[in-house]
Design a protein with these regions (language model features):
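Flexible "cap/lid" loop of the alpha/beta hydrolase fold
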Residues: 98, 102-103, 108-139
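Conserved alpha/beta-hydrolase "acid-adjacent" motif
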Residues: 216-222
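Conserved alpha/beta-hydrolase catalytic His-Asp/Glu region
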Residues: 124-126, 139-189
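Short beta-strand/loop motif that positions the catalytic acidic residue
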Residues: 203, 209-211
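Conserved HGGG/HGGXW glycine-rich cap/lid loop of the alpha/beta-hydrolase fold
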Residues: 5-58
Length: 272
């Protein structure tokens, strides 16, 4: 474990494993444990817990944004001595990785996008449930906000269509730092990676995009769209976490490991 100081925030960094270096970021509300559960053994993984996540502080700057989080991650890569690395992550982490690849092509040698939730625009419709939860916490607090949300049309719809998403949304009300973290939720749900379809089309690196069905926050269509937009992307559909969590993570790690192994001898992927 290491730390990085940014704008008054002490950010926690994990640097574990050996071999090909992959900067792999967690999703919104996640942290090191989530990244570790997703990533296969046999490679070097660097994960920065974004501001307000895990053991990382919130810092002084507002609003929270993908630009902020991506700049923090790049600073962590600098501190780790990585000139060139594979960038990846799940959900929010995928959007951070995509931004890094498009904005810093000289630094990113490969791309892994797991269950992406953003394409190119800010505040996509699939982020509406998270924005709704954030607003309820900020306006009503956790107890009353949870009660209101439980009776909402959004909760009813997700109960039938994407129960795993609903469980994650209720988890935001249970966080000990729920009130403070709600601002992170609100800001990130309203933001976007800040890149265009043209930026994605210009990428000239190996890329893996992974998606699954039964997920309203991370639509399979989002993964399809990104895979089609990136010239050298490989698309993989895995079993939904909502139906088989163990199988989901097993297939996820297998896909990532196969991608990294298949490109481990490619000169452009070897960190300099």
């Amino acid at each position: 474990m290491g730390t990085l100081l940014r704008d008054g925030a002490t950010l926690r960094i994990t640097d574990t494993g050996e071999g090909l270096a992959v900067v792999f970021q967690h999703g919104l509300g996640g942290g090191e444990a989530q990244a570790g559960q997703t990533f296969p053994a046999g490679f070097r993984r660097i994960t920065l817990e974004c501001r307000g996540h895990g053991d990382s502080g919130l810092g002084e700057r507002r609003p929270f944004s993908f630009e902020m989080f991506a700049d923090d991650v790049l600073a962590a890569a600098d501190q780790a001595g990585l000139d060139r690395f594979v960038a990846g992550g799940g959900s929010m982490g995928a959007a951070i990785a995509l931004r890094l690849a498009c904005r810093h092509p000289q630094r990113v040698a490969g791309l892994i996008l797991v269950r992406p939730a953003w394409i190119f625009t800010a505040a996509p419709g699939n982020m509406q449930p998270i924005a709704e939860v954030a607003e309820l916490i900020l306006e009503h607090g956790t107890d009353k906000g949870r009660t209101i949300f439980a009776r909402s049309e959004t909760a009813t719809r997700l109960y039938h269509q994407a129960p795993d998403n609903l469980s994650s949304l209720f988890g935001y009300f249970d966080r000990p730092d729920a009130k403070a973290f709600a601002q992170v939720l609100a800001n990130i749900a309203a933001d976007g990676p800040g890149i265009s379809e043209r930026d994605a089309a210009a990428l000239d690196i190996p890329a893996l995009v992974i998606g699954n069905e039964v997920d309203a926050v991370h639509p399979l269509s989002t993964a399809y769209t990104l895979a089609a937009a990136i010239p050298d992307a490989v698309f993989a559909e895995i079993r939904p976490k909502a139906r088989d969590s163990v199988g989901h993570f097993s297939e996820l790690r297998t896909q990532i490991a196969a991608f990294l192994q298949s490109h481990s001898k490619v000169r452009s992927l070897i960190p300099s």
